[in-house]
């Protein structure tokens, strides 16, 4: 479904390249490996194994220019109202740096810096309090980002505090977490933008009761008064966030409180520094050498010109095992839209399904389908050049597998035995971090954030709302009383029948 005139020339390029193999593209463009690689700070990214050539890339860049992507990026950074449906700015970039001369952004940066200083005081107080464990309760953007970063960067030994995350309303998750902890040495953080999220309120009540009160409870919310009142949390233990920060973009804010507890406040600030470095690049680099722009345009090529309906992310570093789940929310909640900013239906397909896992485990699960299945699945392969553990041979084997898989997917290998034939032609992007440092992880996450925004500009959709998640939550709130024994009118025939089954 791609009928927009801006794609016309790109369709002709896609048709022209239909039979071209990735090795033939490399052979036809002697400088391709160098020209389709960028280094931004601690990140090296290569698009050389994608299936566009120089002419097609120029057409993609022309589309970006036609859609005024550069100006749109500037509007985002300046704090203009890019979230039209909710009448808000999207100033997550101001949480991590002052990179643009604009009053709204400067004020947001100053506000965020002041709250971060307050957070630092709380971090140091908790580190010195005798508390050994912290339970962080949140869901979605209040959980996935902090959980990812804390898991990726937590020290192997010597951590001052152990941070545990609970998100699912399933009581088994909280039960398993609390079973290993001592309430006298545990603190809790409740994170919710509205403090009306069912999962967080229910889990928060369990945690509050288990702790014996609110003395060691903290909260992060854009509704701090409601947060303080709901669990009688002292105002000096409630950190604010703001409605100009979307949940899935909020780990850089006080939502990152559990990150700072898990990895240390200084390393949390280094995470922000890495993201700010990518911000400056996204804002200032020309489109043709702009890493998030090129990543976003590559995804446009694979989705709209080649029709690929899914996208895989493979992290060849176990510490990044949670990155695919984080990116699922970032990408699919931002881009899973069917109407344009003006409410009219989109004229192109939008977001593919994002999924993935950690290498080398994934080679023994779904890579069979990647290599020989009927669907071509573009992929991002992410690895680290240097390791922090003492097992050098293991790290070398990990990198060897990463390189081998990208080569095999791209080049394939013919065989007279059709069962052993590898067709190749599977595109991938290679992303290498110098090492898994806070700066590198911050830059990586910020790159994906900006690439998502680029795609939203091309598709003319709003990347910063998520109304699609509301209906199911509303229905669940109405059905909960029925499961608790109340007489509730249920209109849906199937739901009525299942409720009857559940009550037997």
Swiss-Prot record:
GO cellular component: cytosol
UniProt entry tagged with the keyword Protein transport: no
Annotated SUPFAM superfamilies: SIS domain
Highest taxon of the lineage: Bacteria
Signal peptide: none
Localization per record: Cytoplasm
GO terms classed as biological process: gluconeogenesis; glucose 6-phosphate metabolic process; glycolytic process
InterPro entries, per database record: G6P_Isomerase (IPR001672), G6P_Isomerase_C (IPR023096), Phosphoglucose_isomerase_CS (IPR018189), SIS_dom_sf (IPR046348), SIS_PGI_1 (IPR035476), SIS_PGI_2 (IPR035482)
E.C. number: 5.3.1.9
Pathway the protein acts in: Carbohydrate biosynthesis; gluconeogenesis; Carbohydrate degradation; glycolysis; D-glyceraldehyde 3-phosphate and glycerone phosphate from D-glucose: step 2/4
Molecular function GO labels: carbohydrate derivative binding; glucose-6-phosphate isomerase activity; monosaccharide binding
Similarity remark: Belongs to the GPI family.
Protein name as annotated: Glucose-6-phosphate isomerase
Name of the gene this protein is made from: pgi
